[in-house]
Each structure stands twice: as structure tokens, then as C-alpha cells.
Regions:
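Conserved DEDDh/DEDDy metal-dependent 3′-5′ exonuclease domain
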Residues: 133-241
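Helix-hairpin-helix
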Residues: 21-67
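Generic, well-ordered alpha-helical scaffold segments in large soluble proteins
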Residues: 41-44, 56, 88-91, 121-126, ...
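Acidic, Mg2+-coordinating catalytic module of metal-dependent nucleases/exonucleases
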Residues: 1-25, 41-44, 212, 220-291
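Conserved RNase H-like, two-metal-ion catalytic cores of nucleic-acid enzymes
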Residues: 79-158, 179
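Active-site-proximal structural scaffolding
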Residues: 3, 9, 46, 74, ...
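Residues lining hydrophobic/aromatic ligand-binding pockets adjacent to catalytic sites
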Residues: 72-79
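Short, flexible loop/turn elements at secondary-structure junctions
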Residues: 14, 97-101, 124-126, 140-141, ...
Length: 291
């Protein structure tokens, strides 16, 4: 009932729901906030299946998700996706961060639960289609922030779009770094001015039934680029696992051999994140470059 999530979500909610009949295509796959009218209709009729929700109570994006889910046929407006990215010329950079946070800060100048970037990957795509990759990873146990900022500025050059997936995350980390290191602030904030978010392009112009209401890169990538699979990675396959691996690498009891193994797993995982963006960009733009 409503009390299960008010004022906070009950810790047993998942368990209780597991005892109930599971919807084949659940309403929770609908993106965005449900309108008051839609929620009232769902509650009044006890609806759980997406197919039973009236179209007239859905916004355009929700209608699209419902239609794709029921038909099993993906939606892709490639022309509109290409148009959205047409202004951004090569060379281009594709950037991803990995971060860690501590309830009790372990590094001077950081605050509780502050997202501290410890790793990045950057792929650079030239006008001729040449693809280069640069990476940063610090598992020494020292505060990685300053070295991270210096390496990031060097890796991203001075011109060309910097593509990310969910720009709010990377740009916020860059702002944090600019505040901590005023001497680098101008160069860091200049990076933010070049950031272009691929997430809205995916959200507005692409949807596959396998996404199940999510536009995370790990939901979109297997649909658009089935040859790439995070599940094939050894050890680190998502951001949460990257955090856990980083903490293990910092632990005093971790052997040198294990630490080296973790480093390689982290580098491989983050590199796939940025290569995935290159591939998404290629599909969205209809690029003829062989990447």
C-alpha cells in the first residue's frame, strides 16, 4: 500500500513484492513521473501490467515506451539523433569518471560523502577516424584529486566536443576540482564548456524493448551494439563494482598481485565505458568512419 513508501521506502518492500504475482511488463518501466491522474487510475483499478494503462493518461515518451514494449519493435529516429549532434565536429573526446566517497573523509580538504574521482578514461576520435585512448588511475592510497585534474586537462586538449553520458555527474566533479585547485580552475571549467551529453539524444530518439524503462548506457549499449557486453568483463562490470575494487586495492592486506589485477580490471572497465560512447555516437550520427 501507500504506507510502504511513506515517509520512506520500507526495507522489506522488495521481499513483500516478491511474494506477489509478477507483472510480465510492469508499469514501473514507464519513464518519468507518473501524473496524478495516471497514478489514481492505477490505484483505483489495481493495475500492474503496462498493456492495461490507457494511452490518453500517458505523455509522449511514456506512450512510446508502451508501444515499443508491446510490439517488441525498437524505436530509432536516426535522422533526429544525427541532427542533434550535427553541430559537434571532430576531433571529439569521449569521457568517463569513476569516483569514491567516504562517510568519514580520509583525505585532507575533502568532505563527508564527497564524490572523489580516482579514475578516468578518454577516447579521442580524429577527423580521419583514428581512435586513441588515455587513462588515469591512482590506487596508491593518496588523494588522487590533484593528479587527476592535471591529467584530465592534458588528456582533453583545448578544443573539440567532450561527449559524456549523463553530463551532470562529470561536470559537477570538474566544478568540485576547480574549487579545490584554483590555479587549475580556468582550464578545468573550460572543459565543462565543451561537454556534450549523449544521454538526452538516446532518451529522445532511441528505445529498445530490452531497456525496460532505463536509458543507462548499460541498458542502451547491448541493444545498439550487441557485440559489446559489460557481462564479458572480468571482475569489474559496473560503477558499484568499481568502487568496491578501488577500496580493495587500497586495503593494506591486499597483495601486490591482487592490486595489479584490480588495476587492470578497472582500466578495462572504464575504457569500455568511453569506447561504448564512441560506438553510440557513431550509430546516432550515422558516421561512415570505421570505428
Amino acid at each position: 500500500g501507500k504506507h510502504c513508501g511513506n515517509p520512506y521506502e520500507c526495507g522489506f518492500l522488495a521481499y513483500c513484492q516478491s511474494q506477489e504475482p509478477q507483472a510480465e511488463q510492469p508499469i514501473k518501466w514507464l519513464p518519468g513521473r507518473l501524473s496524478n491522474g495516471l497514478q489514481a487510475h492505477i490505484d483505483a483499478h489495481g493495475l500492474t501490467e503496462l498493456r492495461d494503462v490507457p494511452d490518453e493518461l500517458l505523455n509522449d515518451k511514456q506512450q512510446r515506451v508502451k508501444a515499443v514494449t508491446l510490439s517488441g519493435k525498437p524505436y530509432f529516429d536516426q535522422r533526429a539523433a544525427a541532427q542533434a549532434l550535427a553541430a559537434y565536429k571532430l576531433p571529439a573526446y569521449f569521457l568517463d569518471f569513476e569516483t569514491i566517497q567516504f562517510a568519514v573523509p580520509i583525505w585532507k580538504g575533502t568532505r563527508p560523502y564527497q564524490q572523489i574521482p580516482f579514475q578516468f578514461s578518454v577516447h579521442r576520435l580524429s577527423r580521419t577516424g583514428k581512435l586513441d585512448q588515455r587513462a588515469f588511475l591512482d590506487v596508491t592510497g593518496n588523494d588522487p584529486s590533484k593528479a587527476f585534474a592535471e591529467a584530465l586537462i592534458a588528456a582533453c586538449g583545448e578544443r573539440g566536443p567532450i561527449f559524456v553520458y549523463n553530463a551532470g555527474f562529470e561536470t559537477a566533479r570538474i566544478r568540485d576540482l576547480s574549487e579545490r585547485f584554483p590555479r587549475m580552475a580556468k582550464s578545468l571549467l573550460a572543459l565543462n564548456e565543451r561537454v556534450v551529453d549523449l544521454l538526452p539524444v538516446a532518451r529522445d530518439h532511441y528505445y529498445h524493448p530490452s531497456q525496460q524503462g532505463s536509458w543507462s548506457i548499460k541498458a542502451v549499449l547491448p541493444a545498439l551494439c550487441p557485440d559489446l557486453d559489460y557481462g564479458d568483463l572480468d571482475g569489474v562490470q559496473d560503477g558499484g563494482m568499481a568502487m568496491d575494487a578501488f577500496l580493495e586495492a587500497l586495503a593494506p592486506q591486499t597483495s601486490k598481485a591482487r592490486k595489479s589485477e584490480i588495476e587492470q580490471q578497472l582500466l578495462t572497465y572504464c575504457a569500455l565505458d568511453t569506447y561504448a560512447m564512441v560506438r553510440l555516437w557513431s550509430v546516432f550520427t550515422g558516421s561512415a568512419l570505421k570505428i
